[in-house]
Amino acid sequence: MNRHEILAKPHWQPNAASPILLNMPLAELQALDSLVEFKSEHNCTELTPSDCHVWARLNGGLNAIDTAIAAMLTADGTAAAALAPLRASHASLSACARFEGISRKPRRDYERKISLYSEDLPATWQQHLTRIRDRRDDGKIKLAPDLYDRMTRKLCQYGWFLRENGMDLDFNITALRAFYTYETTRTSNRGAKLRPATITATFNDLRDFMRFSKAYPKTLIKELDSLLIKLRDRDKLETSQKFAALANIDVTTIHPRAHEILKRVSKYPNPAHRHIQRNRAMAIAIPPLTPLRREWHDLRFGRDLIWSEGRYRLRDYKLRKTRHRVGRETYPGSVHPSVQHFVDARLLQDDDDKYLETLRKRAEEQEWPLFVHPDGTLVAENYVSQVWSTEFGTGAHICRSIVYDIVFSISEDATLAGMLLNDHTSQQARKKYTGDRAKQAALAAAGKEIGDIFDDFDV
């Protein structure tokens, strides 16, 4: 909007001929006009730091505040009443801008150390991968895009190992056994041995590559099947450790812990630290009632999460793990009303409650991320799980087990709802995530039902 259009507005008419306004830099006049209109729209008698902070969040952040301060100094000098709240909001935004978190984007560049590039694989392997991808795209085999990518990465790791050890890049018993020994003895970048589930996934992917390519003898694939049985037995021990962690969690303390963190936010003098604590509280409160996998970091208002009928709801959302399946239903998830104030707190930050509707609307229009660092960068993919690990000693995957604990205490029929909520499509998955408390609840319910039957027949 140019100067003439701005000064033609009714609220500028008394001062339209002012030399100060006529000579003020256009950017400053535009900022001043925007602030005046914001003040009128939201019935602000006197600007507060919260008013200025919200205006800045809706209009470009620190740059908008800097320009507005310059405009105030030009128009009214250092005596301008709005300078104090503008500077207070500037200090808050500056503190958040200085925050440096571990962001999801851009990905760090790294040199491959234990993997080949896919173009360095043998030509026959590359041809097999191409055919597998084409068959997947034609619907002839069921293989999620993420799993195809993982299979390719595991194949590159296997190829690197063979090359480094002077072995032919091929599939045979000797090579696979040598690779197994390597995988079960090497350590990750964090200095720990690979988890059984990781090794199982590696050899499962290699088995799938051989199976889908239809170029390798069935006897070799059966050898891998036998190995995978052993690996899954080892994985069961790790699963039992997960349930040990679950047994140590009193589910009735999860939400109180989230409320405690949110309640203590005001004790942090730095606005960036307050933002971080709100993130942590939300990361604890919401997943038990909507147990997504590693998807929380990617949720956005408007695109995925909308405010509808008094509730934050997922709209046309398909869970990552099963969204590739034809006819897969959208996930009917939402944020339970008992915890939606954690999402409200993420939107409001330190600002007045009267701006909640405005911020909800803008968040949907601009597709703000649900989780974001104080400086506006995206959180890491495993952010929510890291918060759970810090607070409860286990990742957010435990939430799916918590769901089964709860629904089992209701009835066996309720477990179907639990399966839908957890996006599980098989009884095998349900069993894997069912802890001892849930099983005990099911046995108790069955015992009561049998007892009722005996009572009815006076046995």
Give the residues covered by each predicted segment.
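Basic, Lys/Arg- and aromatic-enriched nucleic-acid-binding interface segment
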Residues: 252-294
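Short, charged phosphate-coordinating catalytic segments
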Residues: 217-218, 278-315
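Charge-rich, intrinsically disordered N-terminal extensions
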Residues: 1-233, 239-240, 416, 440-443, ...
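C-terminal catalytic core of tyrosine-transesterase DNA break-rejoin enzymes
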Residues: 394, 398-425
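DNA breakage-rejoining catalytic core of tyrosine-based enzymes
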Residues: 234-263, 325-341
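Conserved tyrosine-mediated DNA breakage-rejoining catalytic core shared by Y-recombinases
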Residues: 299-339
